[in-house]
Amino acid sequence: MAGEAQHADLAGGWLLPEPAPREAICTRSIVCRSFRRNDGLIDIDGRFIDTRPFEYDSDFRGPCPAGSALHHMQLRLSVDRSRHIQALASAMPATPYEGCAEVNPNFQRVVGLSIGRGFRKALRERLGGVEGCTHVLALLDVMAAAAVQAFASSNYAPRRPSQPEPVRVWKLEALVDTCHSYRTGGEVMQRLLAKP
């Protein structure tokens, strides 16, 4: 399918029931990759892409080839060990309207925010409505969740001698009742809370 090279592998691995006869009309992918830096910060690179597998005419962009990106937003968050965003880089390689990229400087308003309770509300206070971009907000929500995994993964990843020891930056108690596996009294929480 045209444009699929921009997305993660979409062909294999599906365990869903066989679908009814259908044809693809849009693919949205949100991909995050996390990296541990030598200075102890964690970088989360995020990419949001929408493509259509057919050629179409846009009232604002003219002819759009099959597989071309309607939306393509990229962000990098640099987060310290206390979960504070230290830096943000942004790019908008493809937008549906010429003026979309005018809000790019506004994304710097997330620098200094802490990823944790209240993060989504703080994002919307700074970047909601005409101050931001719906798609960038969606990407930031996913990147915040990716940051949680990045900090957890950093506890298991091999370290070079120059890198600091990982610290647990998430209180296990904050996970209680956030999903079925973390339910109060469940086996997973009992085992996690019993660890020193």
PLM features: what roles do these ranges have?
Residues M1-G13:
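Charged, compositionally biased non-catalytic regions
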Residues A8-D9, I42, S181-Y182:
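Compositionally biased, low-complexity repeat tracts
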Residues P17-I44, I49-S58, L70-H72:
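N-terminal intrinsically disordered, cationic/polar leader segments
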Residues A2-G3, D50-P196:
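Active-site- and interface-proximal helix/loop "cap" or "latch" segments in soluble metabolic
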